């Protein structure tokens, strides 16, 4: 993966998402993605950030977290960082097309519980690009600090699909999609408005999540659930320690409306189709930080 030390740009407010998404859509046809392309070397920093408790409560309700808790859900800082990530990924110097970009994985490290009423410094940068067997993958890093201490960080990978000669690394063990399903703990019947409710709470109003008509424009037969909603919903059910490490991989889209089965065993969790579990939508694991 290509890496470089980023320069710092300090923001005075949260970027508005709508114009960023529009700019990214307009620039997408001009992109020619490749793993050796240059990428933005800027680290965006937003100091003095406070959480909007009304939006937080809407997010908690949409994802199944208990409302009114003193601490932020483990996935919520991703929502806080999303506008900064979109500012970087919609810019002219980001080489991958925003339209069609697929969120493939997220890794989260939370070093302590994050009070909902605290003041934070938010920072986001693109760590690098890497070849993928289906195209080019970008890694975007989000960090949360309070009092100068790093308390939460994530690494998200986003895939731009294109023709490539890259060979996949040799795989060890059984692919996740071919493993025996984890013990089923719950079956969830998902309404058609899950994407709209999560989009309103998170700000991520990608048209593939909002309505069947807009989803069909991008090749989906129905609206699909946000990947980050699926992992948040699973973690709301599973629970996480105050200091935790989370890793999740997004395997296949969840069509809305639909039925899914939540499975879990020890620190592992997954989401499978309600068709007997043949289709794996999400796999992940959660454990303590630091690891025992």
Language-model-derived ranges and their functions:
Residues 1-30, 34-38, 83-86, 104-190, ...:
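HotDog/MaoC-like acyl-thioester-processing domains
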Residues 2-105, 168-241:
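Hot-dog-fold acyl-thioester-processing enzymes
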Residues 234-262:
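A conserved acidic, glycine/proline-rich C-terminal tail/linker
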């Amino acid at each position: 993966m290509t890496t470089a030390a980023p320069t710092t740009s300090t923001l005075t407010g949260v970027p508005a998402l709508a114009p960023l998404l529009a700019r990214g859509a307009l620039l997408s046809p001009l992109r020619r993605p490749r793993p050796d392309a240059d990428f933005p070397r800027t680290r965006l920093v937003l100091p003095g950030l406070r959480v909007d408790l009304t939006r937080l409560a809407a997010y908690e309700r949409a994802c199944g977290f208990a409302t009114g808790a003193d601490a932020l859900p483990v996935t919520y800082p991703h929502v806080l960082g999303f506008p900064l990530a979109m500012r970087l990924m919609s810019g002219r110097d980001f080489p991958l097309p925003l339209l069609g970009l697929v969120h493939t994985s997220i890794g989260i490290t939370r070093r302590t519980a994050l009070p909902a009423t605290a003041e934070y410094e938010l920072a986001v940068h693109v760590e690098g690009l890497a070849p993928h067997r289906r195209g080019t993958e970008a890694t975007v890093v989000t960090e949360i600090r309070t009092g100068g201490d790093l308390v939460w960080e994530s690494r998200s990978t986003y895939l731009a699909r294109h023709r490539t000669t890259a060979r996949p690394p040799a795989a060890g063990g059984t692919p996740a999609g071919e493993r025996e399903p984890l013990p089923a703990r719950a079956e969830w019947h998902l309404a058609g408005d899950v994407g709209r409710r999560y989009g309103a709470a998170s700000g991520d109003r990608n048209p593939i999540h909002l309505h069947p008509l807009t989803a069909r424009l991008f090749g989906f037969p129905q609206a699909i659930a946000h990947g980050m909603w699926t992992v948040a919903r699973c973690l709301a059910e599973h629970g996480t320690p105050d200091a935790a490490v989370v890793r999740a991989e997004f395997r296949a889209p969840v069509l809305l409306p639909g039925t899914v089965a939540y499975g879990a065993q020890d620190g592992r969790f997954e989401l499978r189709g309600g068709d007997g579990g043949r289709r794996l939508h999400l796999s992940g694991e959660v454990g303590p930080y630091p690891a025992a």
